């Protein structure tokens, strides 16, 4: 399986006004280069680049986007890549330890640990996501973590880091 230090960093380029910069995270789900990230990480991007921990950089093509679940599927032109295994998110319990891997504030390949605080949450005031059942965690999730995996202690992905709820936004 994939080690936490092998989580890719996703960069995008837009014509204007935003320039190049690490804006999200993602994770490989197959040896032939399929990557999961958040829709909001890649939506509207003119070019998407994925950097692996070994510093190889790949251009990525968007295969599919799902705005209601905030999921994007990307494809790299590569083979024999390490990839994650999925766990059972339904089996996650409140109090379970979890680990988020991502690039908060552009600090690539960072890890943060915490516990599952609640299950079945919706996002207050956001009708687009109110029907989605989210896992709430106290793991430090910041800008740049979006699209990265949430691992259980067995090393399986049980969630995708998507958004934070705070009084400061």
Q: What residues fall within each predicted segment?
A:
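Serine-dependent protease modules
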Residues: 1-169
């Amino acid at each position: 399986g994939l080690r936490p230090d092998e989580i890719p960093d996703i960069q995008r380029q837009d014509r204007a006004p935003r320039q190049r910069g690490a804006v999200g995270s993602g994770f490989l789900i197959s040896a032939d280069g399929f990557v999961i990230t958040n829709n909001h990480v890649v939506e509207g991007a003119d070019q998407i680049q994925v950097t692996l921990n070994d510093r190889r950089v790949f251009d990525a093509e968007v295969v599919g986007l799902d705005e209601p679940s905030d999921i994007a599927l990307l494809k790299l032109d590569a083979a024999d890549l390490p990839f994650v295994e999925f766990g059972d998110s339904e089996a996650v319990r409140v109090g379970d330890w979890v680990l988020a891997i991502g690039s908060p504030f552009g600090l690539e390949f960072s890890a943060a640990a915490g516990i599952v605080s609640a299950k079945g949450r919706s996002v207050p005031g956001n009708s687009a996501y109110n029907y989605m059942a989210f896992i709430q965690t106290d793991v430090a999730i910041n800008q740049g973590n979006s699209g990265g995996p949430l691992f259980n202690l067995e090393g399986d992905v049980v969630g995708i880091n998507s958004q934070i709820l705070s009084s400061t936004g």
